[in-house]
Structure formats: structure tokens, C-alpha cells
Regions:
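Residue-level signal for inorganic ion chemistry
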Residues: 65, 79, 110, 175, ...
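Hydrophobic packing residues within well-ordered alpha-helices of enzyme cores
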Residues: 18-22, 90, 182, 239
Length: 258
């Protein structure tokens, strides 16, 4: 779908099992790199606070990959199903950048295509201007479909959300200049969150700041695809059924990595 290189961001402790079960199969089709996100992967001058066990978050995960990535790249959650068309769309945009920097992108999904039948979900609701660029993302943490439609159970009561509200599922496209911005943002995060052993540094927070500062623009690419993931264990049967349906339809082979 447009990509031939992949960098897996993992922990050292799972490397052997990961390479044997996933990496070995992927290496037949991609140039594969392994990058390690560990607590002590910190900028110079910082140390891991005593008692910290929680990973530093998605922005930190991307930052540790800086030595493995030297061209425009896409970022995904490893446990989400985005659909092949989303990858083709973002790959086409990245190929068209022709060395430009500060021109990022993301693939937005219709909110109605990202819900769970088994409980509330957290989604980054996107604001988009007339030019098609992102102006900001706001995390809504209690979204579900009700008899009255889709609502977010916020602190100030239920807020209705339109079916076609664009939301981020963490499918972003960046150019390598992102890493310098990412490190600066992460340094500020470490200083501001000192003493908070559970604070995390997220990609959407970083992107929002770059937009607000005028440092970068983020083009919003639209996907009509159905997103799949397992927010609740009860979501898995539906995910499996839909994957089997796509295999029967010839969209995917039964054995993807053979």
C-alpha cells in the first residue's frame, strides 16, 4: 500500500519473541528496523524518576526512532486496523512533499466508523479549516452511541456529536524535521511534569502545539474505511468476523505474510 520500510518500536524484553512471531514474517516483504523504547531513553540532563514504571507516551516512542528514520514517514498504533486505502492515501501525500518540511498530514475517520458496541471510547475530535488543514484536536473520553445518537459524556453533561465528525486514530504523516520539534517538546514535558510518575507525552499534544505556534501545517486526509480495534475484549469476535469477510471478498489473502 505504498510502504517498504518499517520500524517497530518495542521493548528489549520482548525482542526475541517479537522477532520470531512477527518480525521474521515481515522481513520477507519490508526492510525492517527494531527500535527500543525504554524509560532511560531520555535527553541529556534528565534521569528516570524513582518509582517511574509507566512508558513516556507516544511522542517519546516516535522520538526514540529518530536514528532509524531519515525520510517522510507514517506513524500508526500497532494494534489498530486502518485499512489498506488509508495507507495508500498517506503514502501518496508523503511522496508528493519532495523534500518539504513542516508539512505534515493525518488520516481522519468518520466518528461513526470508529465506535465500539461494548462501551465508551476515547477519540481525538478534529477541527478542520476551509483549506483542509487541521486547526486542533480535542480528546473526548466518553463517546458512545445511544438511542439519541452519538454523544460524549463530558464533565458538563452529554454533548451530541455528528456521525461524520472527523476523528484521529493516530495515523499521522511527518517529515524528519519532526524529531527536533519532538525532542524540544519532550524536554519541556519532562520539566513541567516532574514529580508526576504517570504523566505521558502524546503525539496529539505535540501536533496541537506545532499548529498553534505556526511551526507546521497538518493536512487532513479523509478515509471512508471502517476502523477496527479491540477496546474491549468483547470487540474481538466482531473484528475476527470482519477480517474473515474481507478475506472471502478477496480484499486480503488468507495468509497475509506468506
Amino acid at each position: 500500500a505504498g510502504f517498504r520500510r518499517v520500524a517497530f518500536i518495542i521493548k528489549h524484553e520482548i525482542e526475541k519473541t517479537f522477532r520470531e512471531t512477527i518480525g521474521a514474517r515481515m522481513e520477507k516483504f519490508f526492510h525492517v528496523a527494531y527500535v527500543y523504547q525504554e524509560l532511560d531513553c531520555l535527553p541529556e540532563g534528565f534521569t528516570v524518576p524513582e518509582g517511574r514504571v509507566k512508558p513516556w507516551g507516544t511522542n517519546h516512542a516516535i522520538l526514540v526512532a529518530r536514528d532509524a528514520v531519515h525520510e517522510p514517514f507514517a506513524v500508526i498504533n500497532a494494534d489498530d486496523f486502518y485499512g489498506a486505502e488509508a495507507f495508500r492515501t498517506i503514502a501518496e501525500y508523503l511522496r508528493g512533499l519532495d523534500g518539504a518540511s513542516g508539512r505534515y498530514c493525518m488520516v481522519a475517520y468518520k466518528l461513526s466508523r470508529t465506535l465500539s458496541e461494548n462501551g465508551t471510547v476515547s477519540r481525538g475530535v478534529c477541527s478542520v479549516n476551509a483549506a483542509g488543514d487541521l486547526t486542533g484536536m480535542v480528546e473526548h473520553t466518553q463517546i458512545e452511541r445511544t438511542a439519541a445518537g452519538i454523544v460524549d459524556h463530558g464533565a458538563n453533561g452529554d454533548e451530541p456529536l455528528a456521525e461524520d465528525t472527523p476523528v484521529s486514530m493516530n495515523l499521522f504523516g511527518f517529515t524528519p524535521d519532526y524529531f527536533a520539534h519532538s525532542e524540544a517538546f519532550f524536554r519541556s514535558f519532562l520539566q513541567e511534569s516532574a514529580g508526576n510518575l504517570k504523566a505521558e507525552c502524546y503525539i496529539p499534544s505535540m501536533v496541537n502545539k506545532l499548529i498553534a505556534d505556526g511551526t507546521a501545517s497538518v493536512r487532513v486526509l479523509r478515509s471512508p474505511a471502517q476502523w477496527f480495534g479491540v477496546t474491549y475484549k468483547e470487540d474481538k469476535p466482531l473484528l475476527v468476523a470482519n477480517l474473515k469477510k474481507m478475506i472471502r471478498a478477496g480484499i486480503y489473502p488468507e495468509y497475509l505474510w506468506r
